[in-house]
C-alpha cells in the first residue's frame, strides 16, 4: 500500500504520468487513473479505471479481472482457458477467439477494430455492448 501511495504522491507533486505494465489488475487499480488492456500485441480495451473495472467491454478484460485474488480468499480464481497465441502466428480474426466463450464465426474471420463504447472507453470486441451488459460465462 505504501508504494502505491508513494507513486501517486510523486505523480501529483511532479506533475508527471506513470506507465505501469502488469497482468495484475489489482495493482493497476491502486495506481492508475486510466487503463489500457492489451492482448497479443493489440489494444483490446481502454478507458478510465472505474468504468473499465465496473463494466468491462472485452472478454479478455473480464478474464483478467476474474484472476485477481480477493483479499478474503472467499472467491476462487477463474483462469482464462487455453493458452495465449504465438505472436508470430496469430489466428485469423480476433486473436482472443480461441479462448473466448462468446466467439462466433465473425470473430474467427474479422479482426475487431477499437471503437468507442460507453463512459469514454474503447473496445476491440464485436460484442462489446453485450459483454458490458451481460458479462461473460465463467471459465471463458
Residue ranges and their predicted role:
Residues 1-5, 137-140:
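Polar low-complexity intrinsically disordered regions
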Residues 3-76:
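P-loop NTP-binding/switch modules centered on Walker-like glycine-rich loops
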Residues 46-140:
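Short catalytic/signature loops enriched in Gly
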Amino acid at each position: 500500500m505504501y508504494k502505491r501511495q508513494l507513486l501517486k504522491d510523486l505523480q501529483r507533486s511532479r506533475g508527471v504520468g506513470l506507465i505501469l505494465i502488469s497482468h495484475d489488475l489489482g495493482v493497476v487499480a491502486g495506481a492508475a487513473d486510466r487503463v489500457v488492456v492489451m492482448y497479443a500485441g493489440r489494444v483490446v480495451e481502454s478507458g478510465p479505471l472505474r468504468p473499465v473495472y465496473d463494466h468491462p467491454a472485452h472478454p479478455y478484460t473480464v478474464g483478467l479481472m476474474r484472476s485477481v485474488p480477493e483479499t478474503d480468499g472467499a472467491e476462487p480464481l477463474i483462469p482464462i482457458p487455453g493458452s495465449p497465441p504465438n505472436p508470430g502466428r496469430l489466428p485469423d480474426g480476433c486473436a482472443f477467439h480461441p479462448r473466448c466463450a462468446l466467439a462466433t464465426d465473425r470473430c474467427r474471420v474479422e479482426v475487431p477494430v477499437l471503437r468507442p463504447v460507453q463512459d469514454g472507453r474503447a473496445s476491440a470486441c464485436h460484442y462489446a455492448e453485450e459483454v458490458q451488459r451481460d458479462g461473460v460465462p465463467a471459465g471463458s
